[in-house]
């Protein structure tokens, strides 16, 4: 059945023009965060004279790698999982560490010369995904997922959304009027919209609030800090058409030891994201196409991106929020967004024009998207009847939430002179899994309650019943 309760699983019923519009909506949802990563990374590689890398991470390469990586992920996942892979923020600490390396071969390097070695470390990090995928394939996904009951995955999904909340507020605070316009338009179209408009509230929020930004800009209004609402300077200088400036990565053991361990954190995030998407869509992606396949897709996308000078890729919560809001679960729509990203990478001027989207609008949109992700986590807990009157479940949830929200800057420690950073979500996931394994009194065993598994979108028994 393709449609029930407003859910659409085959977007082809809408026709190609409407599918293209839905693809644009997903592209806009990921765009702001995806292009922010190369901007932040390049800021770490500015030398004492204020000179940055001559060929740092670029927006064009980042967009190409995000789009191509998403298509590769869908191929590995048998075209079944509606996930978009954008730039990962988890490796920012690793980039900063490599930028500050001043021993061995890095002693006489400029900042720009160090950057390819950081990318080389990410290539190895991506290959570690394949190792975990092999382990899961050998031992079976059921045994792995028994360590992730609703008492663990629910709070983790809540943290995925709430950990992004400060970013939404920070962006919105640059111009609260624009942010409220974007948020208000999304709410209006989602609640009162009819037909096609009801399933593209994010796109409508972006378009209408951008029109408002244009009016405010040319009327002489400014942001809260006095800066211009719109800045077209970069778009005026770049060429209309051009190849993304790819550059090959380089390898060094020190840089690998900095970047590769971060994969532990991102793999835990991947499992949380797959659980969130499964719960959102109501399909068991952990079993079919299988967690090992999604890990392979994510790992290969990350390695290939870094191999040619791009950032690591990761499944994007923003697009999960769009799925929940639009109720259109067709992976074809995500693939259209990926194709748009690849096409944009060859048109730097168009990419720059989209980059003029004010931070306040991104913040207003994020209010809805990030909140939706957390709401999915709450629903995960409620629908599975997680008993929070039991001390065991309460302790697990409490520790996960505090770790996920408290370690906002991650946890950095040094091993053998190498600085390693675990993200807040990785800390929360590791803490939750360990507590679930150690504490007595388990009241939920994975695979034994078909209805509970179905509520999570993780019906592990359907394969046995065929």
Feature annotation, model-predicted:
Residues 57, 79-91, 144-153, 198-204, ...:
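Short, non-helical or kinked segments that cap or interrupt transmembrane helices
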Residues 42-74, 261-331:
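Membrane-embedded helical hairpins/re-entrant loop segments and their flanking transmembrane helices
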Residues 1-21, 223-245, 279-283, 294, ...:
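Intrinsically disordered, low-complexity non-transmembrane regions of multi-pass membrane transporters
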Residues 24-28, 148, 152, 172-173, ...:
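Hydrophobic alpha-helical transmembrane segments of multi-pass membrane proteins
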Residues 100, 110-219, 338-448:
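Membrane-embedded alpha-helical modules
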């Amino acid at each position: 059945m393709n449609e029930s309760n407003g859910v659409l699983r085959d977007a082809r019923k809408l026709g190609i023009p409407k599918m293209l519009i839905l693809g644009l909506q997903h592209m806009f949802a990921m765009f702001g965060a995806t292009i922010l990563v190369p901007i932040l990374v390049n800021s770490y590689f500015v030398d004492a004279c204020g000179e940055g890398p001559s060929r740092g991470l670029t927006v064009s390469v980042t967009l190409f790698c995000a789009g191509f990586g998403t298509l590769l992920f869908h191929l590995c996942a048998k075209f079944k999982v509606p996930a978009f892979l954008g730039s990962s923020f988890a490796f920012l600490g690793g980039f900063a560490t490599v930028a500050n390396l001043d021993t061995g071969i890095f002693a006489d390097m400029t900042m720009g010369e160090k950057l390819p070695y950081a990318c080389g470390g990410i290539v190895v990090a991506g290959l570690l995904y394949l190792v975990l995928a092999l382990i899961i394939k050998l031992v079976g996904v059921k045994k792995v997922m028994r360590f992730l009951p609703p008492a663990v995955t629910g709070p983790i999904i809540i943290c995925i959304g709430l950990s992004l909340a400060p970013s939404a507020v920070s962006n919105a605070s640059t111009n609260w009027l624009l942010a409220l316009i974007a948020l208000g338009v999304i709410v209006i179209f989602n609640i009162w919209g009819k037909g096609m408009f009801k399933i593209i509230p994010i796109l409508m929020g972006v378009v209408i609030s951008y029109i408002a930004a244009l009016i405010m800009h040319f009327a002489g209004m400014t942001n809260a800090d006095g800066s211009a609402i719109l800045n077209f300077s970069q778009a005026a200088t770049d060429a209309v058409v051009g190849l993304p400036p790819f550059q090959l990565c380089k390898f060094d053991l020190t840089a690998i030891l900095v970047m590769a361990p971060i994969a532990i954190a991102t793999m835990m995030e991947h499992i949380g994201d797959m659980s969130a998407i499964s719960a959102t869509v109501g399909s068991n992606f952990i079993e079919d196409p299988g967690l090992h396949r999604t890990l392979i897709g994510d790992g290969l996308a990350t390695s290939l991106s870094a191999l040619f000078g791009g950032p690591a890729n990761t499944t994007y919560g923003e697009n999960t929020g769009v799925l929940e809001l639009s109720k259109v679960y067709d992976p074809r729509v995500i693939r259209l967004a990926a194709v748009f990203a690849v096409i944009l990478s060859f048109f730097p001027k168009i990419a720059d024009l989209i980059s003029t989207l004010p931070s306040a609008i991104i913040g207003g949109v994020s209010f809805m998207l990030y909140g939706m992700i957390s709401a999915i986590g709450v629903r995960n807990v409620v629908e599975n009847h997680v008993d929070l009157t039991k001390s065991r479940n309460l302790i697990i949830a409490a520790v996960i939430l505090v770790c996920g929200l408290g370690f906002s800057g991650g946890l950095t420690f040094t091993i053998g002179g190498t600085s390693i950073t675990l993200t807040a979500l990785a800390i929360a996931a590791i803490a939750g899994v360990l507590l679930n394994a150690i504490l007595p009194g388990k009241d939920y065993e994975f695979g034994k309650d078909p209805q509970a598994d179905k509520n999570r979108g993780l019906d592990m028994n359907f394969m046995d019943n065929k």
